[in-house]
Amino acid sequence: YYCADFLIGTHVQPCAPDLILFYHLAGKGIRARGKQVFLQHGIIKDEMEWLHRKNMYMDLFVCGAKPEYEYIRDTFGYPEHVPQYVGLARFDNLIRAERKEKMILVMPTWRGSHYPTGEAFRKTAYYEHFQSLLCCKELEQLLEQQDYRLVFYPHIEMQKDSRRFKSGSDRITIVSKETHDVQKLLMDCALLVTDYSSVFFDVAFLRKPVVYYQFDEEEF
């Protein structure tokens, strides 16, 4: 890691053996000598001060949308050559997407590395609200009436607790990265339900409707 000429990845501290550890080491000036290329894995939609130049070092900061590029260029404090508007490869297939099934895709976002896991996860508002949705009788009836199905795909970092969710209907399935390709789900769905995930940009790009289910907006 420390000997590489280039470190290229979709997360900060790309290729680090331990992302959190090496992030803190970099903050103390202990950085790999290779050029840092941040590809990103979505469009930035929030204030992310920890990505500003005063807190993070990058040699190339890839931007996926022009307004995002202008925002990063004007507010993040990097030299002008660092942020570059070149687009994200994840959008390339979306241009050719023509499929649309009678499927509702539910994709809530990550809740942070300190969010409860294991049995404690069952006591969180996240679990309670989405489990309630998955077992909602009115929703089951609506899916049956309209001949739709619902697919629940939690953020990849939350999927370690996916097995704790239960479906109340054969029209509602709980899936993961092991069984489904997330981009195919985005291309196939007729509608997206999310809380705060920037994946809504992908669905908006496809000109499909988005419903926001933000039960903890004041806390998140």
Q: Model-found features: residue ranges?
A:
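Structural alpha-helical scaffold elements that stabilize or flank donor/cofactor-binding regions
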Residues: G29, K54, L142, K184-L185
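Structural motif
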Residues: F6, K35, L60, M103, ...
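Active-site and donor-binding regions of nucleotide-sugar-utilizing enzymes
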Residues: Y1-L94
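A donor-sugar binding/catalytic signature common to diverse glycosyltransferases
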Residues: T179-F220
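A short, gly/pro- and small-residue-rich
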Residues: L19-G42, K123-S132, R207-E219
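Conserved catalytic-core segment of nucleotide-activated headgroup transferases in glycan assembly
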Residues: A89-F165
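Nucleotide-activated donor-binding/catalytic signature segment of Leloir-type glycosyltransferases, i.e.
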Residues: K160-K177
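Short glycine-rich, flexible loops that bind phosphorylated cofactors or substrates
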Residues: C15-P17, S113, Q159, F200-F201
